Amino acid sequence: LMVLALTMSSPTLLAGVVENYDFKENHTGYTLYFKQINDNEARLMQLNIDNYDTEIVIPSVVKDTYGYEFKVTAIGQLYNEKYNDKGIDFSYMGQCTSIFGNVSNCPNYIKSVAIPESVKTIWPLAFSGSLKDGYGLGCKSLTIPGNVTEIGAGAFKYAKFEQVAIP
């Protein structure tokens, strides 16, 4: 296990509205929105946080409203609908945007984000914030599993972590 200690500036976060999702999971303090990739896979496309003092666990498997299971293999949000899951250029940030909804300043930050072993790709700008607006994911710790084989450009741009663990 490799652990990186990062400097954290003033933490901030989000809460927002998402459209075009296929299914969602409500948890105490946060809601996860998913988009179906194919018959067996889904990606986390948005994370809305209601309680900033929480531990966010992204599941390895999600169910749709009919009970069908989908393995969560990606984290990311398309910039607009003209792009699709299969055509993502991981070196280019123009196709994607952050998984966070509307962002606002918050005096606290979330405890942790745990990404499951099922995730293989983290899209460009997935956990990014904005230097111009001064926001980014404020998080005490993030765990990135060893199964992640691709991390897109700017995936953690302007994010604020105290600790990142990469097994």
Q: Where are these predicted regions, by residue range?
A:
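Compositionally biased non-globular segments, especially hydrophobic aliphatic-rich helices
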Residues: M8-T12, G129, Y158
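Structural signature of tandem-repeat unit edges
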Residues: I37-N40, N51-T73, Y83-T121, K132-E150, ...
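Consensus positions within tandem repeat domains that build extended binding/scaffold surfaces
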Residues: W123-A126, G152-A155
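GGW-centered surface loops in extracellular recognition modules
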Residues: D22-D50
